[in-house]
């Protein structure tokens, strides 16, 4: 497992994550091998880039990566070594499904009934410029009091993230809820919903 602590609270968060992994490793004999590398501002200071080539080369060689938060808004331009590690990793390795489990713990008090769900979010498109633009921010201000933003939704990306969700659901409770606003965003969310329904037809269970 490659640990990339990142910036700000990143080292603190990844250290806590590692303590959990190390406990699990001791209890279950997982045989985990942990290594770490610098990215972000620390790497920029030492190596002149926020994402060293050696790190990118190492990622496909390991079984998993723990990436801490990064302060990419504090980075210099790309020409001066400022590369957003999370965005670059997402694009380079086609990390299209952002999978977020939400599970309540029986030993902790909760306000609502127990929760056990997984959010599957498309991770390569949308409003963020590193997901929808070859160059530029994807935002425009025709005048000082008006801001516009471009959103990208494609059939291919919608189909594959839907398939990931249905495959995941098949191993759980066989239930998928598509979150959308197709009643208003008829073209973009309508396209997304159309692809989800196509995939749903392949999973009658």
What do these predicted ranges mean?
Residues 2-25, 139-205:
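Glycine-rich phosphate/diphosphate-binding loop of Rossmann-like nucleotide-binding domains
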Residues 6-10, 40, 68, 126, ...:
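Glycine-centered flexibility sites
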Residues 6-8, 39, 70, 104, ...:
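Short, ordered loop/turn segments at secondary-structure junctions
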Residues 27-53:
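N-terminal beta-loop-helix "entrance" segment that forms/cooperates
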Residues 30, 115, 203-205:
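A short helix-to-beta-strand connector/capping loop
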Residues 31, 65, 175:
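Residue-level detector of anion-binding/catalytic polar loops
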Residues 33-37, 100, 177:
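General small-molecule cofactor/ligand-binding pocket signal
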Residues 44-140, 146-148:
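N-terminal glycine-rich phosphate/adenylate-binding segment common to multiple enzyme folds
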